[in-house]
């Protein structure tokens, strides 16, 4: 009995009591006072009454009585002094009254005039009489939460499941229910984890019927394995033609790399395979931005000193609606002996973008569709244009274009400059007004009229 009283009183220390030495000493004195003078009078048939909760704080008391019916009450030990406190659920909030013990060992509520011989008699009195000045009465005792019983039941159930595999695992869940009726306000506690239940199902499968053994284990479908290549599985519609053409071009370029390098020399870094649609749009836009008005597109990617840096003969292009992947093929006729960008001071040549029906028919009749989509460019514009590799035949395209030189184009002073140079003598005409002076006069005239 003494051990149960100590567990009840010291098991619920007030919040922050462990940090304060004074509160700890006060609780020790209150516990000694309760054990020596109060316990024999409170015990009913060797057990504590359901309305006595021992050491609990005001905050914990209000949490217990928050959702209880009007008039639900409990008696607790004060955590600030040696005495009792009556707490009950009022009409608008929880109310707390101090219970004092007189010299004649009788109990009285502070502020009241009627005393009682025991706490049980005091509780019975206020269940029939009203508490002044609130005109409220006590109804039912708020039971203590049976936390220890619940934990003991869970522990016994787990121990029985692991140690005695002969018993069915359902006993672990049946023993969770405590023997005594637990309080509705008992705090939720962790139940038996799924891991222990799964282990118990695996240990004793012979005690279950065939249907139960099939329903008991819950199996989760494995996650799908991720693909190592996005280009192989991610695209299954018509739009994957772009990637198929790109892989075919890479295979053809790798297969013919050794023979092509022996005949034509090292291929420039810019002539490698690119994304067909994006690279074609970039190159066409660059060519249109660099050309002057009235002239065809200037050959992009050509350096006057180093020759071609990228291969402009084949620009990959894919139809956006899912049609067959096609490339653009451009043909260069033999260049004039005068236009040699490899020599210093020579003028850049300008070409016109024209369509050739013969090339279209020739490309459509070409049987080989697995070849490379790029052609080798001669290292110097002055040399004869080499034919593409025999094994490399471009795929057909609805539009196949070439370039031809425009006759009568005046040579420019600089190789990379496509604009006409204006002689310096024209800027020194006598009848022309100097631009800074003209702007200065207009500015002062504007300010004069404004103010």
Swiss-Prot record:
Biased composition (Basic and acidic residues): 279-291, 426-436
Pfam families per the UniProt record, alphabetical: SH2
Record GO cellular component, one term: cytoplasm
Bias (Low complexity) ranges: 221-232
Cross-referenced InterPro entries: SH2, SH2_dom_sf, SH2D7_SH2
Ranges for domain SH2: 51-142
Family annotation (Gene3D superfamilies): SH2 domain
Coiled coil: none
Annotated keywords: SH2 domain
Residue spans of biased composition, Polar residues class: 306-316
Residue numbers spanned by region Disordered: 180-232, 256-321, 408-436
Protein's name in the database: SH2 domain-containing protein 7
Species lineage: Eukaryota, Metazoa, Chordata, Craniata, Vertebrata
């Amino acid at each position: 009995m003494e051990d149960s009283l100590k567990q009840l009183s010291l098991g619920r220390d007030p919040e922050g009591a462990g940090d304060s030495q004074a509160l700890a000493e006060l609780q020790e004195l209150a516990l000694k006072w309760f054990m020596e003078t109060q316990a024999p009078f409170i015990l009913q048939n060797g057990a504590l009454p359901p309305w006595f909760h021992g050491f609990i704080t005001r905050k914990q008391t209000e949490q217990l009585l928050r959702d209880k019916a009007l008039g639900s009450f409990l008696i607790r030990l004060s955590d600030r002094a040696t005495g009792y406190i009556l707490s009950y659920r009022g009409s608008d909030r929880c109310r707390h009254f101090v219970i004092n013990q007189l010299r004649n060992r009788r109990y009285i509520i502070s502020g009241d005039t009627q005393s009682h011989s025991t706490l049980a008699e005091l509780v019975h009195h206020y269940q029939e009489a009203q508490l002044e000045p609130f005109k409220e009465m006590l109804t039912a005792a708020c039971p203590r939460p049976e936390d220890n019983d619940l934990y003991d039941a869970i522990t016994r159930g787990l121990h029985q499941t692991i140690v005695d595999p002969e018993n069915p695992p359902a006993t672990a869940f049946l023993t969770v229910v405590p023997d005594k009726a637990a309080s509705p306000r008992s705090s939720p506690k962790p139940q038996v984890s799924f891991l222990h239940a799964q282990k118990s199902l695996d240990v004793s499968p012979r005690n279950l019927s065939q249907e139960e053994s099939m329903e008991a284990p819950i199996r989760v479908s494995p996650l799908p394995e991720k693909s190592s290549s996005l280009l192989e599985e991610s695209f299954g519609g018509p739009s994957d033609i772009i990637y198929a053409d790109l892989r075919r071009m890479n295979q053809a370029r790798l297969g013919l790399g050794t023979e092509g390098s022996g005949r034509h020399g090292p291929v420039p870094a810019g002539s490698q395979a690119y994304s067909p649609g994006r690279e074609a749009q970039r190159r066409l836009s660059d060519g249109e931005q660099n050309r002057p008005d009235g002239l065809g597109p200037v050959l992009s990617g050509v350096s006057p000193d180093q020759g071609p840096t990228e291969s402009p003969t084949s620009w990959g292009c894919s139809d956006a609606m899912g049609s067959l992947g096609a490339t653009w093929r451009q043909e260069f006729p033999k260049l004039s002996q005068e236009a040699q960008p490899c020599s210093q001071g020579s003028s850049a040549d300008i070409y016109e973008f024209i369509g050739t029906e013969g090339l279209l028919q020739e490309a459509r009749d070409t049987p080989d569709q697995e070849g490379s989509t790029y052609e080798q460019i001669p290292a110097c514009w002055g040399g004869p244009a080499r034919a593409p590799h025999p094994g490399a035949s471009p795929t057909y395209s609805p539009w196949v274009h070439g370039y031809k030189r425009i006759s009568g184009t005046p040579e420019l002073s600089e190789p990379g400059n496509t604009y006409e140079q204006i002689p310096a003598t024209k800027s020194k005409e006598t009848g022309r007004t100097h631009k800074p002076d003209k702007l200065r006069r207009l500015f002062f005239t504007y300010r004069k009229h404004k103010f």
